[in-house]
């Protein structure tokens, strides 16, 4: 791997700033839940309704994507969050990436939250690609406060329209192909990635002529403890709301994740044949190449990073 390169974040921050950055980045979900519960329990009905009304207002307030203060906050998070775990990024063939091309990064696994993607954000500055967007569940963008912070970090709703438009505009896109259903299939003793029937991202990559890039994050499954129901109704609900309700917690039951090292590994780009209307056979061919490349990536690096979980491709 002569063109490989590794980036580490241990010297980018001190512990105080890394904790503050993590709290701002990931604390909004728990903050919203705590605010609603406290208002319902401790406030009179009129004030509780006012709190709920204000939260609803934050769902619909337009977001300035280029906000000076928003982007400054996002830079702060990207600079210091990688140090918290810490997160490292290993690129197998750094020189294979061209700054003027748009790539489709298939990031796995989803875990509770795919927070290792911070290593791929353009504001982190590890990858030699100037324009990167992360596609995320649309439910995030209906969550007060979280939608603002994550938009400034470079996340956008995962839709075919957004995906195609971004690639067409020269943006590389990071997505988790397994999505909501992968979260439903999580196990504590294995890495389950839901890929066998996930081919839409390959179709769009072929339509745009964008190379597929396998990415795996080792250690992400261990940064949160979690519990979820095990029933068909739960799966149907998750699909309906395009989000997986799950009980998760970190340090002392807080939203701060446990400090476990994460190793994000980026494989070599897989060139695809550009075609406006790819056939099912053509899609299956490149989908198979991506799945095999992801499996090989996992096997090549699991011993290097000391990972003992088994990879299961569902």
Curated annotation (Swiss-Prot):
* Known catalytic reactions: an acyl-CoA + a 1,2-diacyl-sn-glycerol = a triacyl-sn-glycerol + CoA; 1,2-dihexanoyl-sn-glycerol + (9Z)-octadecenoyl-CoA = 1,2-dihexanoyl-3-(9Z-octadecenoyl)-sn-glycerol + CoA
Q: What processes does the entry annotate via GO biological process terms? A: glycerol metabolic process; lipid droplet organization; neutral lipid biosynthetic process; triglyceride biosynthetic process
Molecular function terms from GO: diacylglycerol O-acyltransferase activity
User: Is Transferase given among the entry's keywords?
Assistant: yes
A single GO cellular-component term from the record reads: lipid droplet
Signal peptide positions (record): none
The places in or outside the cell where this protein is found are:
Endoplasmic reticulum membrane; Lipid droplet
Q: Where are the transmembrane segments?
A: 18-38, 41-61
UniProt membrane topology term: Multi-pass membrane protein
| Disruption phenotype annotation | No decrease in oil content.
- Coiled-coil annotated residue ranges, if any: none
Record's keyword terms, sorted: Acyltransferase, Endoplasmic reticulum, Glycerol metabolism, Lipid biosynthesis, Lipid droplet, Lipid metabolism, Membrane, Transferase, Transmembrane, Transmembrane helix
Q: Give the chief site where it resides.
A: endoplasmic reticulum
Q: Per the similarity annotation, which family is this?
A: Belongs to the diacylglycerol acyltransferase family.
Q: What does this protein do?
A: Involved in triacylglycerol (TAG) synthesis. Catalyzes the acylation of the sn-3 hydroxy group of sn-1,2-diacylglycerol using acyl-CoA. Can use oleoyl-CoA, linoleoyl-CoA and linolenoyl-CoA as substrates. Has substrate preference for linolenoyl-CoA or oleoyl-CoA compared to linoleoyl-CoA.
Protein name in the entry: Diacylglycerol O-acyltransferase 2
């Amino acid at each position: 791997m002569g063109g490989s390169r590794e980036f580490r974040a241990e010297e980018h921050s001190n512990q105080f700033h890394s904790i503050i950055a993590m709290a701002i980045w990931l604390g909004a979900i728990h903050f919203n839940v705590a605010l609603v519960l406290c208002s319902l329990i401790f406030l009179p009905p009129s004030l509780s309704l006012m709190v709920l009304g204000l939260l609803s207002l934050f769902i619909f307030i337009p977001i300035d994507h280029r906000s000076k203060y928003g982007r400054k906050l996002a830079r702060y998070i990207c600079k210091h969050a990688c140090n918290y775990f810490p997160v490292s990024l290993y690129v197998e063939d750094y020189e294979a990436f061209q700054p003027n091309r748009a790539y489709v990064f298939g990031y796995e696994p989803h875990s509770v939250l795919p927070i290792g993607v911070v290593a791929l954000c353009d504001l982190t500055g590890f990858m030699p690609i100037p324009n990167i967007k992360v596609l995320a569940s649309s439910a995030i963008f209906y969550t007060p406060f979280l939608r603002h912070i994550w938009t400034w970090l470079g996340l956008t709703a995962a839709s075919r329209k957004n995906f195609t438009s971004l690639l067409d505009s020269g943006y590389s896109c990071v997505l988790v192909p397994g999505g909501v259903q992968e979260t439903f299939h999580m196990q504590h003793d294995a890495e389950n990635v839901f890929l066998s029937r996930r081919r839409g991202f390959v179709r769009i990559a072929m339509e745009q002529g964008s190379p597929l890039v396998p990415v795996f994050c080792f250690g992400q499954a261990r940064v949160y403890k979690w519990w979820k129901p095990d029933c068909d109704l739960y799966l149907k609900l998750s699909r309906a709301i395009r989000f997986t309700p799950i009980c998760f917690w970190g340090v002392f039951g807080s939203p701060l994740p446990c400090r476990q090292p994460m190793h994000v590994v980026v494989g070599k780009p897989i060139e695809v044949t550009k075609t406006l209307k790819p056939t099912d056979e053509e899609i299956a061919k490149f989908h198979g190449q991506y799945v095999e490349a992801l499996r090989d990536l996992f096997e090549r690096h699991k011993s290097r990073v000391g990972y003992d979980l088994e990879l299961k491709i569902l």
